[in-house]
């Protein structure tokens, strides 16, 4: 992510946290709560997209390093069972 996107991500995340706090307080009129919910959903969607993009970039980088991450969050060959599974698949 670029510095500009990092800053926007942080701002959107901070705003989302503010919105969640306001909604959890329960002290808002219905209309205000609905507006905040919609704004929060937009912030959450943006943050999720940026996180997905960053994860994809890391996966591409790791593939280039011949050390891809598995879905369990560890690298191939990190655990002894990995080598046995790879041999069975071959």
UniProtKB/Swiss-Prot annotation:
GO biological process entries: DNA catabolic process
GO CC annotation terms, alphabetical: cytosol; exodeoxyribonuclease VII complex
A GO MF label: exodeoxyribonuclease VII activity
InterPro entries: Exonuc_VII_S, Exonuc_VII_ssu_sf
Reaction it catalyzes: Exonucleolytic cleavage in either 5'- to 3'- or 3'- to 5'-direction to yield nucleoside 5'-phosphates
The protein's Enzyme Commission number: 3.1.11.6
Region (Disordered): 62-90
Acidic residues: bias regions: 79-90
Principal location: cytoplasm
Compartmental location: Cytoplasm
Keywords in alphabetical order: Cytoplasm, Exonuclease, Hydrolase, Nuclease
Composition skew (Polar residues), residue ranges: 64-74
Subunit structure: Heterooligomer composed of large and small subunits.
Family statement drawn from the similarity comment of this UniProt entry: Belongs to the XseB family.
Function in brief: Bidirectionally degrades single-stranded DNA into large acid-insoluble oligonucleotides, which are then degraded further into small acid-soluble oligonucleotides.
PANTHER family given in the database record: EXODEOXYRIBONUCLEASE 7 SMALL SUBUNIT
The protein's name in its UniProt record: Exodeoxyribonuclease 7 small subunit
Species whose genome carries this gene: Desulfovibrio desulfuricans (strain ATCC 27774 / DSM 6949 / MB)
Gene: xseB
């Amino acid at each position: 992510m670029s510095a500009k996107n990092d800053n926007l991500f942080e701002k959107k995340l901070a705003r989302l946290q503010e919105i969640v706090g306001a909604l959890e307080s329960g002290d808002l009129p219905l209309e205000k709560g609905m507006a905040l919910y919609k704004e929060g959903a937009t912030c959450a969607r943006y943050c999720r997209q940026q996180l997905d993009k960053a994860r994809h970039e890391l996966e591409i980088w790791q593939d280039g390093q011949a050390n891809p991450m598995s879905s369990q969050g560890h690298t191939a060959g990190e655990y002894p069972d990995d080598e046995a599974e790879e041999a069975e698949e071959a």
